[in-house]
Amino acid sequence: MRRKMKLWRRVSGAIKDKLSLITATDEKFTAAVIKATSHNDVSMDIENVQFIYRYIQSNPSSFKPIIRAVSLRVEHTRNWTVALKCLMLLHGLFFSGIMTVDSIGRLPFDLSGFGRRKSRFSRTGRFNIFVRAYFMFLDERSILYYNKNMIRLEIIVKMQRIVDSLMRIKPIGETPLVIEAMEYVISEVVLINGHICRGFAGFLSDVQSNMLEISSAEADLAMNIVAKSLSQREKLFKYFEFCRGFGVTNAQETSNILRITESQMIVLDKLLHIAPELDWKAAKVTPVTAADMVDLVTSEERSNTPSDFLTF
């Protein structure tokens, strides 16, 4: 009986995808979006996903129409597979090097209540919870660089919050599509932690070289970042261990960990004592853009610490 139900769901999903393709006669990328986010719960259609990314790269003006096509796909489905694939498709844009994605702002759809009417103990209940957690992270990630006037430390604080959101996304069994989504999640954890490391190292370097004058509020913010990283680091290692237990292959502990040197610790300690004396001055803080955050350390530092966690 179960096998028949599973077969029926697959046939039903294939029919829905076919009907959507028939009506998608306006743009060729619309068909690619439908194929990339099909009802097939095994894996993403990488061929069509890559086509969409290449299409945006070569036709930047297609970015918004493609986002609209994905939004329509989300709004017309109650299927967790389709919803998750739409989120993964958008998430992949952040890895693709398409700078336009940083201007997306809040996601143009809302999955925070996806499947809430169903019991968490229903057949799809746990998958609906997974979709909601993934959406909450991605909605926060999409506005990371939206405010161009944020200072470096404010961006780092937002990044730490995003890491918290990522750790709320937990693998469910060994469902292939969920494991694939978890690999996206782990890649994001590593990427964001790399930005945190380089951003904070760049901040300390500027302070040490007297290139940056900070206020006492910013000194407090820096110390809060340190405290948060200390507590977050332990949670991250446990999270990675948990994910490995479900077969998430890229959830490996990093062997080389970026450490704050003794001289940098001295700088941190001095911040709280020196900063109040600088409050009367205008802080010489330059807003940091998305591109700046990726390139805040020298090439030598980047090669020595590719994507590691910040520890103290």
UniProtKB/Swiss-Prot annotation:
Record's keyword terms, sorted: Coated pit, Cytoplasmic vesicle, Endocytosis, Golgi apparatus, Membrane
Protein name, as recorded: Putative clathrin assembly protein At2g01920
Subcellular location: Membrane, Clathrin-coated pit; Golgi apparatus; Cytoplasmic vesicle, Clathrin-coated vesicle
Span of domain ENTH: 21-152
Signal sequence bounds: none
GO terms for MF: phospholipid binding
Classification via InterPro entries: ANTH_dom, ANTH_N_plant, AP180-like, ENTH, ENTH_VHS
Organism taxonomic ancestry: Eukaryota, Viridiplantae, Streptophyta, Embryophyta, Tracheophyta
The species this protein was found in: Arabidopsis thaliana
GO CC list: clathrin-coated pit; clathrin-coated vesicle; Golgi apparatus
Short name of one Pfam family: ANTH
Keyword Glycoprotein: no
